[in-house]
Amino acid sequence: MAEIKPAEISAILRKQVEGFESGATLEEVGTVLQVGDGIARVYGLSNVQYGELVEFDNGMEGIVLNLEEDNVGVVLLGPSTGIKEGSTAKRTQRIASLKVGEQMVGRVVNTLGFPIDGKGPIGGDLYEMPLERKAPGVIFRQPVTEPLQTGVKAVDAMIPVGRGQRELVIGDRQTGKSTVCIDTILNQKEFYDAGKPVFCIYVAIGQKASTVAGIAKMLEEKGAMAYTVIVAANASDPAPMQVYAPFAGAAIGEYFRDSGRPALIVYDDLSKQAVAYREVSLLLRRPPGREAYPGDVFYLHSRLLERACKVIADDGIAKNMNDLPESIKPIVKGGGSLTALPIIETQAGDVSAYIPTNVISITDGQIFLDGDLFNSGVRPAINVGISVSRVGGNAQIKSMKKVSGTLKLDQAQFRELEAFAKFGSDLDSVTLNVIEKGKRNVEILKQGLNDPYTVENQVAIIYAGSKNLLRNVPVEKVKEFEADFLAYLNSKHKDTLNALKAGKLDDSITDVIEKAAKEISAKYN
């Protein structure tokens, strides 16, 4: 048996003691005073910051939204089961963030960036992006000059949207607001196939889970999930998750924007986010304002929508952008853009309510969808009179700008005369001509569900309409004429369409279009 040497043992013990480090870490811990309705009041976190994440003893996290004299109000990011009076809550010294990466594309995630589509965890390189972030300053932006093709004829012709713009889609329920935005996402497939993808983020706020599943399935079938991320905070999710879902979507969009690529984000819809924010604010006992919304509901939407912009093309300047997250600094490039299409639901067409007027004043224009037009069969039901794009005109391609120049005015004139014509039948030939042309243009601007048009097809058919080349085609045959006309151009004159796509519109091109229209319209005489 080996002899035990005390000197060796004491040397080993001394070595162990010298290498020992105290594992005690200081944590600031508070106690839950009250919990319920997704809100916890915590006592003892005297140094906690506004917007900081707090972790409860069951692993649940919450965001500090109220700092009061003797306690803090924390909104819970999940169910409150397992948190009770007397539970502990500790500071994390982090703000709410989510991990974003290339492999997030094609997935359905929740507000915290965790996948909820049952396809396993998100792999690849992930970058931490904060939910709340300051919008880029004026120095880091440039004007909107590139078009974002929506594939919707009425929008691309009369209310054009540019990359980096915020264009509000507003209307009553069931007037096709989501459809306009989803068609825009579907239309980006053309750019994805050409190797210049516009990454799309669809944020579903307070919708039924079945509706979101239906949208995801449809995008999958049409091949659009290859460049789309869906962020879902369903109707059954806690109000804080619905409030922060748009911020999560914006953070994902900023990842693409700041790495020099174009992105498009749809917020469907911000009315539900405002309602969820009102619920959270009232539970936190903040004083209510107009329509019981809190005083900072304008700021909620403005700080979200200001994050959509066109970033300056200079990489050197872009790398110094204000409030850049540390994680993405190595991959920052200039020239990216984030285009926002927020949706707002109105009650009985009242655009002058609180939330609609707020968002109208924040955005760069609005597309107003009219229930009466929708019910009369004009779909998309865009009311051209009060729809406007404040910056998109500079982003239209030249050929579209030329053909659609008078279209908006013509249609407004037609609507006015149409109402007048109901009272009298003896109209002069000029008025009759305006009405007949207007009726055909209304038919041209109609479009099927999930059926976006390429820009060259749009320019060709709108040229035919604005030059009154369809005057001999009966109104009920216009859609038939359109299908024949575009099929003829696509099979016989592909080069003409390619020239239109490149923005050219000269006499040789218009001659081809006019001859084709004459030839096809002869069938309908």
Curated annotation (Swiss-Prot):
The keyword Translocase applies. Its EC number is 7.1.2.2. ATP binds at residues 171-178. It is an enzyme of class 7 (translocase). It is a peripheral membrane protein. GO terms for cellular component: plasma membrane; proton-transporting ATP synthase complex. InterPro entries: ATP_synth_asu-like_sf, ATP_synth_asu_C, ATP_synth_asu_C_sf, ATP_synth_F1_a_nt-bd_dom, ATP_synth_F1_asu, ATPase_a/bsu_AS, ATPase_F1/V1/A1_a/bsu_N, ATPase_F1/V1/A1_a/bsu_N_sf. It is found in: Cell inner membrane. Pfam families: ATP-synt_ab, ATP-synt_ab_C, ATP-synt_ab_N. Keywords: ATP synthesis, ATP-binding, Cell inner membrane, Cell membrane, CF(1), Hydrogen ion transport, Ion transport, Membrane, Nucleotide-binding, Translocase, Transport. One of its GO terms (molecular function) is ADP binding. The record marks 387 as: Required for activity. Produces ATP from ADP in the presence of a proton gradient across the membrane. The alpha chain is a regulatory subunit. F-type ATPases have 2 components, CF(1) - the catalytic core - and CF(0) - the membrane proton channel. CF(1) has five subunits: alpha(3), beta(3), gamma(1), delta(1), epsilon(1). CF(0) has three main subunits: a(1), b(2) and c(9-12). The alpha and beta chains form an alternating ring which encloses part of the gamma chain. CF(1) is attached to CF(0) by a central stalk formed by the gamma and epsilon chains, while a peripheral stalk is formed by the delta and b chains. This is ATP synthase subunit alpha. It comes from Flavobacterium johnsoniae (strain ATCC 17061 / DSM 2064 / JCM 8514 / BCRC 14874 / CCUG 350202 / NBRC 14942 / NCIMB 11054 / UW101). The gene is atpA.
